[in-house]
């Protein structure tokens, strides 16, 4: 049976709900995703499987982990109990916004994190997040981290000179930022980030492909490629979601139970996964065509973009390895 082998480095996604729906979000998180948070039993099982798979350190992400602070603390404690090092916790800093009800208790939360041994935050700050969180909030959180002794890093600090042209106390629309920066700030930000065009970012690749990055190509250009997609079991930067699904790096929207990624994947159980893993885009296209897929006559900017749309189509056919919500949410918010 196939398995992921040693789990080298990963993240635990404690939820999918977020206060933002960023254009580059690989996991298609948003304010309208389910409001649940990983429960204790699932988190305990995740920790056990991570240990079994050889993983000794993780970060915590989402969604937005700080939407349920008590739930976050519970996960931190379980990781510590399992002997798994917590590297950092990701946040968009919404809870440090001067207008947020949570603002009053920020320092108390930071001190609580320190007491639990969770001493580092990864604080998001960039033009995409600025559509949903005033960029002053990450800066305010960073300042409070310094006062309380919590380590942090701004992801990505390089955008601060650009953002300084905006009002730090309010969010900004695409139209505002295009007028302030340029008509191509979305594409320029993606290039500066070095992002992969998965999740909601498939829209960035498609919108700007003809103008800046080549052209749209017919599906026929890509479907003869039989190279297997072994990235589906890559463990260099995998994630485990709140339902204990293993999610490979970059190829989001595909999921298999973490227990099977660790112990072995039964043959024949996941046709979409097996098609991609063994026969690449060619095999996946064949599977989709058999079920009625018609390629977009306008074309696709890349093989991976075509793959996303093939999986989106197949996600409506009840394949358990495909997260239908991921594809719907990826296409829902981009405008």
Stretches with model-predicted labels:
Residues 125-231, 235, 240-241:
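Classical nucleotidyltransferase
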Residues 72-75, 98-111, 165-173:
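Distinct, well-ordered alpha-helical segments
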Residues 49-52, 80-81, 108-117, 141-144:
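Acidic (Asp/Glu)-rich catalytic clusters
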Residues 37-46, 319-332:
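Short cysteine/histidine-rich metal-coordination sites, predominantly Zn2+-binding motifs
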Residues 27-36, 310-325:
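Iron-sulfur (Fe-S) cluster-binding segments and ferredoxin-like electron-carrier domains
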